[in-house]
């Protein structure tokens, strides 16, 4: 009945988005640069491993801006060494 109460509150979502925008601004990252980086990282990882989706985040930690990448590797990796092209 009140399923909208179970989800994330819009003020929390807005706060997270604002923090992300501020971190990008402080790091002087132009729009679209993180998306391009995400695509490039995923392309490189796929050369060596079967990989799925990726997530790249920028955070402000004190005086530093931190870039974090999380890339899901597909199951069934037989040989983690370099694949032949």
UniProtKB/Swiss-Prot annotation:
* Signal peptide bounds: none
InterPro entries in alphabetical order: MinE, MinE_sf
Gene Ontology BP annotations: cell division; regulation of division septum assembly
The gene name reads minE
Q: Which family does it belong to?
A: Belongs to the MinE family.
Sorted keywords for this record are:
Cell cycle, Cell division
What name has this protein been given in UniProt? Answer: Cell division topological specificity factor
Q: Which HAMAP family match?
A: MinE (MF_00262)
The record describes the protein's role as:
Prevents the cell division inhibition by proteins MinC and MinD at internal division sites while permitting inhibition at polar sites. This ensures cell division at the proper site by restricting the formation of a division septum at the midpoint of the long axis of the cell.
């Amino acid at each position: 009945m009140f399923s909208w109460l179970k989800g994330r509150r819009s003020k929390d979502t807005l706060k997270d988005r604002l923090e992300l925008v501020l971190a990008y601004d402080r790091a002087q990252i132009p729009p679209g640069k993180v998306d391009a980086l995400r695509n490039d990282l995923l392309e490189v990882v796929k050369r060596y491993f079967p990989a799925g989706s990726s997530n790249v985040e920028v955070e402000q930690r004190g005086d530093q801006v931190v870039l974090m990448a999380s890339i899901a590797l597909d199951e069934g990796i037989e040989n983690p060494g370099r694949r032949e092209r």
